[in-house]
Every structure is written in structure tokens, then in C-alpha cells.
């Protein structure tokens, strides 16, 4: 029996919905990254983007264990001398709750050219509503 390799033309992506309210960030990010990569399918091929779309709602209510809310920081660098800035998770949760999940999922994707394309399949919303009702997403429990 020959090994099956998926083709880009034959992939039929689906849409999945994940509710982040009260779910630990790491568990949520692993689940989302595996769906985006296509690891949950029998037709998974590492060199082809076989993944599905993921919609994450309630990003502002994602759970962080321990003291990560006060201790963890996100570092940004402008490229200029003295252009480094750091922001705590609590501040990012107030201003951009989507960034926390996007950053975690991005870290769990492979570091190659396909990862940038895979990351476009992640849609994160801070509240309970989203704009992709027409795609009939399947609800996934984490």
C-alpha cells in the first residue's frame, strides 16, 4: 500500500468554533493549532496545508493559571535604539484580548513558510459574537 499524500486542490476545509471562557490558554492553543495544521485528520500531510478554520470566541475570558497574569510579559521591539517595550498580560487582556490567543497559537505552529498561511485560518474575537455564522462552524469542546 502506498503512502497517501494530500494535494492542495483536494483539501476541503471546515470551520470550527471554540469557546475560550474559563479554558486554560495552553490547552486552547494546542487544540486550535492542531486543527489549523490538520493534525486531527487522517489525511494529514506535513508539507501541505490540510488544516481547517478555527473561530475562537470569548478571548477576554481565557484562563491563566498561577501568577501568569501579573508575571508574564510580551516584549515588543521597534527596531530603534531604546525601542524595547514590555506589556503585562493583564494590560494586553484589557486592550487586545485577541493577541494573547494569537500569540500562543503562533508559537505552537511550525516555523516555516506554511505557518504564515496557517495563521490566517485563525479568527479570534474578544466577545461572544463572531462574523462567521454563514460558515456553520462546528462547536469543539476543549
From Swiss-Prot:
MF (Gene Ontology): mRNA binding; structural constituent of ribosome
Ranges in coiled-coil conformation: none
TM stretches of this protein: none
KW Transmembrane helix (keyword) present: no
GO BP: any one term: negative regulation of translation
One Pfam family this sequence matches: Ribosomal_L13
A single cellular component GO annotation: cytosolic large ribosomal subunit
Keywords: Ribonucleoprotein, Ribosomal protein
Family in the record: Belongs to the universal ribosomal protein uL13 family.
Function noted in UniProt: This protein is one of the early assembly proteins of the 50S ribosomal subunit, although it is not seen to bind rRNA by itself. It is important during the early stages of 50S assembly.
Known partners and oligomeric status: Part of the 50S ribosomal subunit.
Name assigned to this protein: Large ribosomal subunit protein uL13
Species of origin: Opitutus terrae (strain DSM 11246 / JCM 15787 / PB90-1)
Organism taxonomic ancestry: Bacteria, Pseudomonadati, Verrucomicrobiota, Opitutia, Opitutales
